[in-house]
Amino acid sequence: MAIQALLVILAVLLVLLFLGVPISYAIAVSSLTAILSSIDLNVAVLTAAQRTFVGMSKFSLTAIPFFILAGNIMNQGGIAKRLVDFVMAILGKMPGALLVTNIVTNALFGAISGSASAAAAAVGSMIRDGADEQGYDPAVTAATNAASSCSGLLIPPSNALITYSLASGGTSVAALFMAGYIPGIIWALCCCVVGVLLAIKLGYKGTPGKFDWKNLGVCTLRALPSLSLIIVVIGGIIGGVFSATEGSAIAVVYALILAFCYRSINLKSLWKIIVDSAKMSGMVVFLVGVSNILGWVMAFLQIPDAVAAALLSLTSNKYIILLIMNVILLVSGTFMDVTPAILIFTPLFLPICQSFGMSTIQFGLILVYNLCIGNITPPVGNALFVGIKVGRTSLSKVMPYMLMYYVAIIGGLLLVTFIPAVSTALPQAMGLM
């Protein structure tokens, strides 16, 4: 019965998505369709409305709109150029300096803005012209830009990790933020290894001349105010000075002060940023609300228990089960955006992982890491196609290089999956677990 209900949910969901129905409505309709065989229609609709309201009324959910607004303000604040100059001043002498600079800057910018697509667009456009002048293949720079754009989604502050906290029943946001650093850095390092190897193979050299300490000092001073946002907000949250929600509001105030000091926005552009952020936040908050319907349906029909029993009937080896889950998440991530996928798969797979002793922290990082890979993989791959568009190249030219990045990034995924300390060492050291 439970497996049949799961198949109904997936079938209806896929059909509705194929027809172009917004993901929020598709989740609600597919969930209700699956449970109508068990309870009365009126009861199902009333309960669905109540679950949606409960899901949208969680106080911790207010952190997401604030972080979205702060990220959008910073996107318009001219920080990409400052970060690129800062990283280039440090790494400019390396082989393929522009590739490595792109990777590291994407990690920093993605952490500040909270968006892989925004990082790929802003940083990629800054790198592109210099790369063209130095004879870099546009396909190589586009692949590097796209592949590294998602590392910032793992490095806090991360809306994906906040969403997972809500979906998992209140996992500590501070612990998740602390846990995200090592996987995010692993992602960036994997990309750096591939970038340097490509640079050596293709003959891309660093900037000539001696290391310029004066330029480094100037670039550091220019980038420091932007980088301080991460230090202030994350330091305050992890240190217990304020909650994630309060930290998100502080991030907005800090971003506003910085943007006005840089004179990068005015009142007219600020209003547009607020409206765009409100639209984006409305979609996310409503999505979180309707995902509560899915969680209720799965719990009512005992779908996670049935899935666990089905997997255990195949094998009792937890490592094989984790590999199967990774494959499912990787494939699903290529068709779905990160937020809805988190809300769908958390209630399905988290109980299974908890049954063999995995912490909610580690599962959260495995989940988000997988879905980030999907964000740079066709056929949907939002960040991938942004990188291709910014790089002025084509998918067919980029994919041979992307395959190299996929191998390295999936290697990082295996570390996150099979070595718990990768996700749990920092939270445990900080007393957050």
Q: Positions of the model-derived regions?
A:
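Alpha-helical transmembrane segments of multi-pass membrane transport proteins
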Residues: 1-433
